[in-house]
Curated annotation (Swiss-Prot):
This is Cell surface glycoprotein. It comes from the Archaea. Keywords: Cell membrane, Cell wall, Cell wall biogenesis/degradation, Glycoprotein, Membrane, Plasmid, S-layer, Secreted, Signal, Transmembrane, Transmembrane helix. Pfam families: PGF-CTERM. S-layer protein. The S-layer is a paracrystalline mono-layered assembly of proteins which coat the surface of the cell. Residues 137-157, 383-402 have a biased composition (Polar residues). Glycans are attached at residues 253, 455, 563, 715, 774. Residues 205-216 have a biased composition (Low complexity).
Length: 875
């Protein structure tokens, strides 16, 4: 029984296996048929490939040289791939994944590249690519791209298209799917059936309509009965290729509203900032006019500036001005402006024409030419009808032209501007608030005549600023390096370096040339041109200055100053050197004069420049033309007026020549030359000159030895000190130790000493083979010498005498016994020399035992000593 049951089970299982194999064969053939590559016009919502219907190459077979795509399934071997007839066994040729099998179906992430039957380049195989829908565009009836934007509903049948490019035409068709904003598929309702077939295939399907244009494929849309809202359009492969880049989704807003809208980026801007705006909800390719009335213009602007209120950027195609005759050039407006008129008095509007491109029209407004108030921007409708008389097609400015409204056959000032006859599509307002300008420098204190940096910050849109100073009344212009204005850089900062505020021909320069406390400010050039002549005004009232975009700060102006010193050595300059150094500070000056006068009336002078930090320094000034003796040295400054005394001379070099060849050119004594210098500078009438006076001796070079550390041990250090009037660095003092035969034992030197002329040299004898004895120390500066003697003793001998110097303490500790016995010391000198020991012993005993009972013992000893002394006296 068991045997029979097992046999029945075996037969049953065998039958199942046969049926399953048959079913698999049927399923495979069905799938292959369903996966024909690019097969046909069976897809009512998509095109066929370029091979055309019924072409055998468009079925699922793939032969050598074919292009296949990631994600394709059920490919058939349609050619000879060498010994391997299974396409899935093709091997990758090169790269990191060389040798891997292609697979069938092909994985969606299979590495792209060449695959051949043996994995070698040049043999039979296929090329694997990534399937891509490269572009999807929704277009209106005017072929304008409204992808992601607005598509107006049609009133006369199909008038919109979806067009696409893709790269897998050889594999399968594209399919379009449209969903409304609720996710409901409405493809059949909006897509015209069988549209967008490539031109070569149109004759194969009489139901095809529409055009693919410059794209690979196209579908025609009929929006006549479509609800308003946002629609999502997906274009992808019809079967296998619906993933990744093979699927592309876009959106479009379908609306029946014919009224455009205007959106501003901000509802408040600082005067000078650019304000961006967008014209939306209008068909692609339309033109709209935007206007700002002339009453919004800023006072003082030029006609050219007014014509640029709407910037010619983005989608703006045209900008300009409108008067009662229509569009008018800026030059004509400028000629029409009277002496007491503003540009706003002879114009109606500033306008811009904006094209709808890519779903919207983008423009920008230059707010620096608008008043700081609330500004209205008006948007007018667009039309394709030439009879409407406003912007359309190439006639961009037609909405601001004049229409013959009085019927006299002439467009003139008696007629109306077209925009006056139209209702606006939209209007928006924004507030222009006054900006700020900050003056960072100068501020605080300023020394008249000195160089200073002028810098600060300004709001966006301020191109130039002007600097003004105020004493008690109006603001007066400050000229800066010959210019009345300072440019503002792209980062909204302005800067001028090394400016002398007191130099210039304007009233502000004159104000800051005198000491005092003032206001200094900076203002937008636009607000400083009150008469609109294109240049800033020399004078502004406080009200005019404060009402503009401006900023001010306090400035304290101080007078020029002078201080300095000459470098001498021990109050002298050696005639052997014939040079002297000077340094100091002269804030507010570019140059000073240094002058020298000797007792015989000779003079030497030269100009010394002052650095940006107000300091000056000059080395090696030549004074060899002066006679030895007392010399006076002077530093001269021409003061804040830049003129020496009342001479009318402002040239430093000219005054130097006057000193050397005028005052010192005759038989004048030194005092007379000095009197002339003073009389024509600091002592002159109403002079503001400054002077620094010093005195030194010009004499022969001299170097002396003042002290040596003698005696010195043979292994010790000899310290030599002295004075000199020579200039360090340029001279060297050499110290040499000479033996009794004037032979050199060792040499040291120095070239460093201070203005007191004191020099010092240490001579190390530890490494010198020198015997105890007397030697000569010589100091030599190259021109002058001085000598002194020194004693060298045995090494360590000075240290042996050290105990003698260490015994002062015992002497100071026993003063009382010495003072109590003066008479015995003088009368009996011999016993005195014998008695110190008992005294010191008694002292020690006293300090060592100071308890009760010792006092009586000491007294007894004292009595015995007194008795003995009396006996000795009797003898």
């Amino acid at each position: 029984m068991t045997n029979t049951k097992q046999k029945i089970n075996a037969v049953f299982l065998s039958a199942l296996m046969v049926m399953s194999v048959f079913a698999a064969a049927v399923a495979f053939s069905g799938a292959a048929a369903a996966a024909n590559r690019g097969a046909g016009f069976t897809y009512s919502t998509g095109p066929t490939d370029s091979n055309g219907g019924g072409n055998g190459d468009s079925v699922g077979q793939v032969g050598p040289g074919a292009v296949v795509f990631q994600g394709e399934e059920d490919l058939e071997d349609g050619g000879n791939f060498g010994s391997n007839t299974d396409i899935g066994q093709l091997q990758k040729v090169s790269g990191d994944n060389s040798g891997i099998l292609l697979g069938n179906p092909i994985p969606q992430d299979q590495p792209t590249g060449s695959y051949t039957f043996d994995g070698n380049s040049g043999t039979d195989g296929v090329t694997l690519q990534t399937p891509r829908v490269t572009s999807v565009e929704v277009q209106n009836g005017g072929s304008g791209d409204v992808t992601g934007s607005t598509l107006q509903t049609s009133s006369s049948g199909p008038d919109a298209f979806v067009r696409a490019d893709y790269n897998f035409q050889e594999a399968e068709d594209l399919e379009i799917t449209v969903e409304d904003e609720n996710g409901l598929e409405v493809t059949n309702e909006i897509v015209v059936q069988k549209t967008g077939l490539p031109t070569a295939d149109r004759n194969n399907d009489n139901g095809a309509s529409g055009s693919n244009g410059d794209f690979d494929v196209g579908w025609e849309l009929d929006t006549t009965d479509i609800d308003e809202g946002q629609y999502t359009i997906t274009v992808e492969g019809t079967e296998d290729l619906t993933f990744g880049d093979a699927s592309e989704t876009v959106t479009v807003n379908i609306t029946s509203d014919q009224q455009a809208s205007l959106n501003l980026d901000n509802d408040e801007v600082v005067q000078g900032e650019n304000l961006q705006f967008n014209v939306e909800n209008s068909p692609e390719g339309n033109y709209h006019v935007v206007l700002v009335e002339s009453s919004e213009f800023r006072d003082g602007i030029t006609a050219d500036q007014a014509s640029r209120i709407f910037r010619n950027v983005g989608d703006v195609q045209e900008v300009g001005l409108v008067d009662n005759t229509g569009p008018v050039s800026a030059s004509t407006v400028a000629s029409n402006v009277g002496s007491d008129q503003e540009v706003a008095d002879v114009t109606r509007y500033a306008y811009g024409v904006v094209e709808i491109d890519g779903g919207s029209g983008v423009g920008s407004i230059e707010t620096q030419f608008l008043d700081d108030s609330s500004v209205d921007v008006e948007l007018y409708p667009a039309s394709d009808s030439s009879n409407d008389g406003y912007a359309s097609g190439g006639s961009h400015a037609s909405s601001v032209t004049v229409r013959d409204t009085d019927g006299d056959g002439t467009d003139d000032s008696e007629d109306a501007i077209v925009t006056d006859l139209l209702e606006t599509d939209d209007d928006q307002s924004f507030d222009v608030v006054e900006g700020e300008i900050t003056l960072d420098s100068p501020s605080g204190a300023y020394i008249t005549g000195s160089q200073i940096d002028v810098n600060g910050t300004a709001n966006q849109g301020v191109d130039q600023v002007a600097l003004y100073a105020r004493d008690n009344n109006d603001y007066e212009l400050i000229e800066i390096d010959g210019s009345n204005t300072v440019s503002v850089d792209g980062d909204d900062t302005f800067s001028e370096e090394d400016v002398v505020l007191s130099q210039g021909s304007k009233g502000g320069n004159s104000i800051v040339s005198l000491p005092g406390s003032y206001r200094i400010g900076v203002i937008d050039v636009q607000d400083a041109d009150l008469d609109s002549d294109g240049t800033v005004d020399d004078t502004l009232t406080t009200s005019d200055f404060n009402s503009g975009v401006s900023g001010a700060t306090a400035l304290r102006v101080t007078d020029t100053a002078l201080n300095g010193t000459f470098t001498t050595y021990n109050g002298q300059i050696a005639s052997d050197d014939g040079q002297i150094d000077v340094d100091g500070q002269a804030p507010g000056k570019d140059n000073v004069i240094v002058a020298f006068v000797d007792s015989r009336g000779n003079a030497a002078a030269q100009v010394v420049s002052v650095d940006d930090d107000d300091s000056f320094s000059e080395e090696d000034i030549d004074i060899t033309s002066l006679s030895e003796g007392t010399v006076t040295a002077h530093i001269l400054s021409s003061g804040r007026d830049g003129e020496y005394g009342d001479t009318g001379t402002s040239s430093d070099s000219a005054f130097v020549n006057t000193i050397e060849t005028g005052y010192a050119g005759g038989s004048s004594t030194g005092d007379q030359v000095r009197e002339q210098i003073l009389a024509n500078t600091v002592d002159d009438t109403a002079s503001d000159d400054l002077i620094v006076n010093e005195q030194f001796r010009l004499t022969d070079g001299l170097t002396t030895i003042e002290s040596v550390s003698s005696p010195v041990e043979a292994n010790g250090t000899l310290e030599v000190q002295g004075n000199t009037n020579r200039v360090p660095d340029d001279n060297t003092i050499t110290v040499e130790i000479l033996n009794s035969e004037d032979e050199s034992v060792t040499v040291e030197s120095t070239d460093e000493w201070g203005s007191d002329g004191q020099w010092s040299v240490n001579v190390d004898l530890s490494d010198v083979d020198i015997e105890p004895g007397n030697y000569t120390v010589e100091a030599d500066d190259g021109d002058n010498t001085d000598r002194t003697s020194v004693t060298v003793v045995e090494a360590g001998s000075l240290e042996e005498e050290q105990p003698d110097t260490e015994t002062p303490e015992p002497d100071t500790e026993t003063p009382e016994p010495d003072t109590e016995t003066p008479e015995p010391d003088t009368e009996t000198p011999e016993p005195d020399t014998e008695t110190p020991e008992p005294d010191t012993e008694t002292e020690e005993a006293t300090t060592e035992a100071s308890g009760p009972g010792f006092t009586a013992a000491i007294a007894l000893i004292a009595l015995v000593a007194a008795a003995l002394l009396a006996v000795r006296r009797d003898n």
